[in-house]
Amino acid sequence: MASTALSTASNPTQLCRTRASSLCKPVKGLGFGRERIPRNITCMAGSISADRVPDMSKRELMNLLLLGAISLPTFGMLVPYGSFLVPAGSGSNAGGVAAKDKLGNDILVEDWLKTHGPNDRTLAQGLKGDPTYLVVESDKTLATYGINAVCTHLGCVVPWNAAENKFLCPCHGSQYNNQGKVVRGPAPLSLALVHADVDDGKVVFVPWVETDFRTGDNPWWK
């Protein structure tokens, strides 16, 4: 009896490992039941190289991206056990979540302000695992809003450039002012906002559903 063998060369979609995860798609080749022909594989990088991001170490960026990547697929599995796994008080502010630093620890506002000066913008883990900037005001207080770091063009993480007092996207050149309002395309919209509340000394990110104070418009991210 004849048997049919499944070759990995006939798999229509393959994954490869690079510095940034990439999706590899075959450019040429035949399907099942035909003569095998060597395939050319084209890898299209799905994210940018960390060494192109200014004012932020590679380790910090990769830690935050890894946290976000891990949190999304595991969240659904953990929901039924959330009351056992989430510390008391976490996420109690109308759908809010405790802000996490690059090591995954809760951010204590008093300690944060001791190590982050005026006009600082530093990434934390925010709602849905998105990298989100905590903002320190010029008077050394924590701003009541945080800024989602995901570019509204194609989803790159946008670094803060203190020298230019702007968020500058390294992917396609979009620019945002120091509050995350878009000032140069191709990004069509400003960076999303979240509330940065303080609960029992910890920073808590809460969804922003009110008018965007930067534009006077309803929030596009609702």
Curated annotation (Swiss-Prot):
InterPro entries linked to this entry: Cyt_b6_f_Rieske (IPR023960), Rieske_2Fe-2S (IPR017941), Rieske_2Fe-2S_sf (IPR036922), Rieske_Fe-S_prot (IPR014349), Rieske_Fe-S_prot_C (IPR005805)
Instruction: Kindly list the places in or outside the cell where this protein is found, as annotated in its UniProt entry.
Output: Plastid, Chloroplast thylakoid membrane
> Any idea which residues the transit peptide spans?
1-49
> Which protein family is it in?
Belongs to the Rieske iron-sulfur protein family.
Co-factor note (free text): Binds 1 [2Fe-2S] cluster per subunit.
Q: Which organism is this entry from?
A: Triticum aestivum (Wheat)
- Subunit and partners: The 4 large subunits of the cytochrome b6-f complex are cytochrome b6, subunit IV (17 kDa polypeptide, petD), cytochrome f and the Rieske protein, while the 4 small subunits are petG, petL, petM and petN. The complex functions as a dimer.
Q: Which GO terms describe its biological process?
A: photosynthetic electron transport chain
Q: What name is this protein filed under? A: Cytochrome b6-f complex iron-sulfur subunit, chloroplastic
